[in-house]
Amino acid sequence: MKKIEIEPMTRLEGHGKIAIFLDDKGNVADAFYQIVEFRGYETFLRGLPIEEVPRTVSTICGVCRAVHHTASTKASDGVYGVEPTETAKKIRELYLNAHYVEDHCAILYALGLPDFVVGIEADPAERNLVGLIKKVGVDVGKTVLKKRFAAVKVLEMLGGKPIHPVAGLPGGWSKRITEDERKEIEALAKEMVELGELTLQVFEDVILKNEKLLELITADYYRVVVNYLGTVDDAGKVNYYDGWQVGIDTKGNEVFRFKGKDYLNYIAERVVPWSYVKMPYFKQLGWKGFVDGEGTSLYSVGPLARCNIGDMNTPKAKEAQEKMFDVLKERPIHYIMAYHWARAVELLNAAERVLELAQDPEITSPDVRAELGEVTGEGVGIIEAPRGTLIHHYKTDENGIVTDANLIVATTHNHAPINIAIKKAAQHFIQENKEINDKLLNYVEIAYRPYDICQACASHALPGRYPLEVLVYDSEGELIKTIRNF
């Protein structure tokens, strides 16, 4: 049996590979997406005081640091049996939504959209952020980078550091927002809203007005019919920070809803021998293997899942969400390329929410931390990360020292559907007597990019470093320097 390997996988966070197995006729028999980074953080956290964990887990991933910090801080509330103050909750939500703007922007422009804007079969040297800017215009590129920095600035103001935050504490937040800071955040939020509107306009001008790309988005070989999991508030609107975790089936019917550690009653994880990452599924439906379609127990999380489950909680984003359903003519939407569209909708939603919270008079209250209670020995923090539902679950001894940790991240939730998506694409494009080249294989690679894979988060990589070698050549082609991290 012939084997094709795509390694490294490109334009994603972390390191993984795709293994495609062909039968004797040259058709695809099977395909696997493998995360090759080793799982380590859950063991590493044991022995730490719970109040140190939020700062520590932010180092799991430099891109996803804000969500691990926030989910872990929520879990630490449970360990100390404390309900954060309303102001603290709003600051945390403000922080999380600013991260959404920063993250969704980076994923769309640097990782997801180059395939569509530059071209799926374009030279890989051009099919990137720089190539995208050449296509949409330097002025647009400058505007995007400037307005994305507005979100980074808010993250630095609230989190204490732009990359690995330190402000989250059990029961609240370590620093209040002054009136001057509130005004600055409000001004920055208005720039973020403009970024959201611009992104949806770029999506419409470049993709929706192109019939071939629209056909690609709605192609059956990029369609994975599974269940969905996401978080909504009591009114059924999407909420990234808090609410009910809701599971729906392939037709959009609610299967269950839960909060906190009840997740153990609804989500099970299956270990497979070829990956360091487990395969979650809806527990009450039982493991049915790597199959999609009605009756499957597999599910997806993330922007498209959230849009399928609940309505956007801000006006402009709600209007954009409704347009997506109108154009694609289904809800729930199962076309995986629509993840990019849903991500653009959420970028605007998060920006609008940052502006709403910045204009909330309670956001500057000095009441940012509640008094801690007795150590309960267990805490669960669940939020919606940009990539999807994120669960941090800790157990401690009577002194608040971590004895056990379980982290279920978005890429883990999506692991099985990603494998199905890759296999479907491979079976469609790799066939008997067909030349296999880089252009063709990119049609397989674009099947995983909508999920915004983060390998480091999924494997909780430790030490989080992949062997890397950089060769520097001069203008004459002579090797002048070699840089290694191993």
Swiss-Prot record:
Belongs to the [NiFe]/[NiFeSe] hydrogenase large subunit family. Keywords: Cytoplasm, Metal-binding, Nickel, Oxidoreductase. The F420-non-reducing hydrogenase is composed of three subunits; MvhA, MvhD and MvhG. It forms a complex with the heterodisulfide reductase (Hdr). It is found in: Cytoplasm. Its main location: cytoplasm. InterPro entries: Ni-dep_hyd_lsu (IPR001501), NiFe-Hase_large (IPR029014). Ni(2+) binds at C61, C64. It is an enzyme of class 1 (oxidoreductase). This is F420-non-reducing hydrogenase iron-sulfur subunit A. Its cofactor is Ni(2+). Its EC number is 1.12.99.-.
